[in-house]
């Protein structure tokens, strides 16, 4: 299944929760979810009862849309989490948080993961001084992530940095906003990752 490229706010309305797919609009109170807190379509205001499988699938879909990855990528990350020793659900979230596009987002250099992914793909991001244009690159604790010199004054990047003064920065990264770089200091604890996803249901889905 390819990555979704349609209207992102319809996705949030479908699930009834904010996935921060339109970061600045959400902060300004202009997201369509706040205006119309029900699913899109003729019968959107009716919430039908969801089966156990439906709930499990829903959680997987939320995680996929939130992190902006395809089914193939998501399954691959899950398989890696399942291979490692420990709580598979928590390991899944930690692996998702290590993706370079997500780290750029968590450091506050992009208002959304989608913009962060574009920044990485277009070669605007360096890891330990070397350009990396693969959004799925797994960042290791201690690695330095920065916006390349020519892109540091990009209006969208600067706007993103300003907005982090309202939202704050993830506690597992150390950021120098003036120099537009950060250090991925450690893996996050599960309780630190505030996302509307019950990873336990995803594990149950893939365990069938």
Swiss-Prot record:
InterPro entries: Ribosomal_uS4 (IPR022801), Ribosomal_uS4_bac-type (IPR005709), Ribosomal_uS4_CS (IPR018079), Ribosomal_uS4_N (IPR001912), S4_RNA-bd (IPR002942), S4_RNA-bd_sf (IPR036986). The keyword rRNA-binding applies. Residues 30-51 are annotated as: Disordered. One of its GO terms (biological process) is ribosomal small subunit biogenesis. One of its GO terms (cellular component) is small ribosomal subunit. It comes from the Bacteria. Part of the 30S ribosomal subunit. Contacts protein S5. The interaction surface between S4 and S5 is involved in control of translational fidelity. NCBIfam families: PRK05327.1 (NF003717), rpsD_bact (TIGR01017). Belongs to the universal ribosomal protein uS4 family. This is Small ribosomal subunit protein uS4. The gene is rpsD.
